[in-house]
Amino acid sequence: NLYDLWTDFSLRHLPKTKDKKKLLELACGTGIQSVRFSQAGFDVTGLDLSADMLKIAEKRASSAKQKIDFIEGNMLNLSQAGKYDFVTCYSDSICYMQDEVEVGDVFKEVYNALNEDGVFIFDVHSTYQTDEVFPGYSYHENAEEFAMLWDTYEDAAPHSIVHELTFFVQEEDGSFSRHDEVHEERTYEVLTYDILLEQAGFKSFKLYADFEDKEPTETSARWFFVAQNVRAYDSYRYYCWVQSFS
């Protein structure tokens, strides 16, 4: 279960204490991860663009008897979202930004939303995943009341892909309705993310892969960045760390 993996990774890297537990989950969707964070003892706020998703999230939190605030909003503007000890952004949601300028803008918004020494964790597709694994990917599911077609293609920009999804859902009268979705994603080289994080103000960050506390390999599918907005740092050590990925 991916949500188990996201939760376990988060708990290893978010230093929650009695006085330090306010968490903002970006792109929270239907609130599955938000509920898990709340059950783990965090004071959770979930933010998402979709009002429909947030309605489901509110019902999910209520059913789980968890007090969670949900905000309809865009991660490109967190000026009204408040201040937090921790911010997370999972399920490669950063990859939905249009370009690296927007990625950098998100990082700046998160930095400003964090309390001092706050931690920001996000995951993105690796360039191996977008360049070698996804292009030509095809998945079809056919059940009695539901069918799904999922095809992925390489897009024009470097390290970018397009997911084309078609759903057929059986209605009460027995007929099937068709729903089409197109998802465009793009990732970047590790050094690009490093530079954008530094420009946003983050001076301390570490890189992991595939939900484990290990450095990425050439075939890692998902990169995890754990960034902290500490004010004082050893600039030489930071420079050497960044250079190790160049």
What are these regions (language model features)?
Residues 19-29:
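Conserved class I S-adenosyl-L-methionine
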Residues 90-92:
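Residues lining the SAM
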Residues 121-192:
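SAM-dependent methyltransferase
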Residues 79-86:
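A short acidic, Gly/Pro-enriched loop at the edge of an enzyme's catalytic core
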Residues 31-77:
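Class I SAM-dependent methyltransferase SAM/SAH-binding core
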Residues 184-241:
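C-terminal lobe and adjacent flexible extensions of AdoMet/dcAdoMet transferase-like proteins
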Residues 2-20:
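Conserved alpha-helix/loop element of class I SAM-dependent methyltransferases that forms part
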Residues 104-116:
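A short glycine-rich, Lys/Arg-flanked "PGG" loop and its adjoining helix->strand segment in the class I
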